[in-house]
A protein has these predicted regions:
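Conserved SGNH/GDSL esterase-like catalytic core that processes O-acyl groups on lipids
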Residues: 35-40, 45-121
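Boundary at the C-terminal end of the N-terminal hydrophobic targeting segment
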Residues: 22-26
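Alpha-helical cap/lid subdomain in secreted, periplasmic
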Residues: 93-203, 207, 211, 215-216, ...
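Conserved catalytic region of serine esterases and O-acyltransferases that act on ester linkages
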Residues: 200, 210-256
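Bacterial N-terminal signal peptides that target proteins for export
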Residues: 1-10
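Bacterial N-terminal signal peptides
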Residues: 9-18
Length: 256
């Protein structure tokens, strides 16, 4: 008798759910957020970021953030000019941008570029990116160590001016390097962000770049997010803090 009563109550409950438009097998569906698709157009300053999936891992460790997928058109020694002059064949930067499979295109020029070579190609790439419905981020790397500090200052000046002109975010990595170095850096401090050739970023420098790119794209704070195991925890924290502080300063400068 008791079992019949329980079954009767269950039937009434299921009937009520159906009458109210709720199916018994309905369950909340957890939607996976759409990834942010990022194309890096650059040269040998970028491979460590791509190879180590630094941007993807930052996003994965950031609770509530969208995942990131990264593609690259990366050629050793390339400039924006050489990327543009490569034309529109398969695998070129222009072809990849025009394919429209991206949300952001990060443009990185060669370390020793001067304004007459930088400005027209930054503008042309920006126009193509905008026409395709994508968003541009200008990535100003640090210069080579032997060009410190003048080359760093040149990179900062050019990218800030172009960022203001085009109304796009910039990754002002040269200023972040200055911030990390401090007022009177030792040789060891200066070399710590570079590879052994003192021209390309080492693991620490690449991670600083990645944190800045992440913040420029997402406007999110990288402090406390994932870092390569080979970077000591205290150094990773300092690099994250440096990236976030510089991102905020640069974002404010672009509005002036």
């Amino acid at each position: 008798m008791q079992m019949k009563t329980i079954r009767g109550l269950m039937a009434l409950l299921l009937g009520s759910l159906v009458l109210n438009g709720v199916r018994a097998d309905d369950a909340p569906v957890r939607q996976t957020p759409q990834p942010i698709n990022v194309l890096l157009v650059g040269n040998s300053q970028c491979p460590t970021i791509v190879r180590n999936k630094m941007l993807e891992k930052l996003a994965e460790s950031d609770q509530g953030a969208r995942p990131i997928k990264v593609g690259g058109c990366i050629k050793g020694g390339a400039s924006l000019r050489s990327h543009w002059d490569a034309g529109t064949g398969a695998g070129t930067a222009r072809a990849m941008i025009s394919g429209g499979a991206w949300d952001y295109v990060v443009l990185q020029d060669i370390y020793n570029v001067q304004e007459p070579a930088f400005q027209p190609y930054a503008r042309q790439f920006y126009a193509l990116i905008k026409e395709t419905g994508l968003q541009t981020v200008l990535f100003g790397t640090a210069s080579i160590l032997s060009d410190y500090p003048k080359g760093f200052e040149r990179q900062h000046r050019m990218h800030l001016a172009m960022g203001k002109e085009l109304g796009v975010p910039i990754v002002d990595a040269s200023q972040a390097y200055f911030r990390y170095f401090g007022e009177t850096p030792s040789t060891e401090r200066l070399e710590s962000l570079f590879a052994t050739d003192k021209a390309h970023p080492g693991l620490w420098g690449s991670y600083l770049y990645a944190c800045m790119i992440y913040s420029s794209i997402t406007q999110r704070n990288p402090i406390g997010l994932a870092a390569p195991e080979a970077i000591p925890a205290d150094i990773a924290r300092t690099l994250q803090e440096t990236a976030w502080a510089q991102h905020q300063e640069t974002a404010a400068a672009l509005k002036k």
